[in-house]
Amino acid sequence: MAFLKKSLFLVLFLGLVSLSICEEEKRENEDEEEQEDDEQSEMKRGLWSKIKEVGKEAAKAAAKAAGKAALGAVSEAVGEQ
């Protein structure tokens, strides 16, 4: 009977150890995936900020061109009178 108890405790102990190791590896994998997701998010954020900057510059250039065109049209209209 004592032999069975020792064997059972040994099996339970080894099972707990292996379970602990598996959980640790799982946590490490989740941490690695989280880091990869963070890196991808940072890359996307950087890309969107660049696109936003380019869009702002394009809008400024378009507004400036439209302003010049409007000023030219007004100048022509005033000059014709």
Swiss-Prot record:
Residues the record lists as Valine amide modifications: V78
A single Gene Ontology CC term: extracellular region
Keywords, in A-Z order: Amidation, Amphibian defense peptide, Antibiotic, Antimicrobial, Cleavage on pair of basic residues, Fungicide, Immunity, Innate immunity, Membrane, Secreted, Signal, Target cell membrane, Target membrane
The reply to whether Chloroplast figures as a keyword in the UniProt entry is: no
- Annotated region Hinge region that separates the two alpha-helices that constitute the peptide: the residues are 54-55
The record's region (Disordered) falls at 24-46
Q: Where is the composition biased (Acidic residues)?
A: 30-40
Tissue specificity comment: Expressed by the skin glands.
Query: Which positions are listed as propeptide?
Result: 23-43, 80-81
What PTMs does it carry?
Amidation permits an increased antimicrobial activity against some microorganisms such as T.album and S.cerevisiae. May contain a D-amino acid residue, since the natural peptide is not identical in chromatographic properties to the synthetic peptide.
- GO molecular function terms listed in the Swiss-Prot or TrEMBL record: guanyl-nucleotide exchange factor activity
- InterPro entries noted in UniProt: Dermaseptin_dom, Frog_antimicrobial_propeptide
Keyword Secreted part of the UniProt annotation:
yes
Instruction: Show which residues constitute the signal peptide.
Output: 1-22
Q: Superkingdom of this entry's organism?
A: Eukaryota
A GO biological process this protein is involved in?
defense response to Gram-positive bacterium
Report the subcellular localization: Secreted; Target cell membrane
As for what it does, the entry says: Cationic amphipathic alpha-helical antimicrobial peptide with potent activity against Gram-negative and Gram-positive bacteria, fungi and protozoa. Acts in a synergistic effect in combination with Plasticin-B1 at doses that are not active alone. Acts by disturbing membrane functions.
Q: Which family does it belong to?
A: Belongs to the frog skin active peptide (FSAP) family. Dermaseptin subfamily.
Q: Present the record's domain note.
A: Has a helix-hinge-helix structural motif.
Q: What is this protein called?
A: Dermaseptin-B2
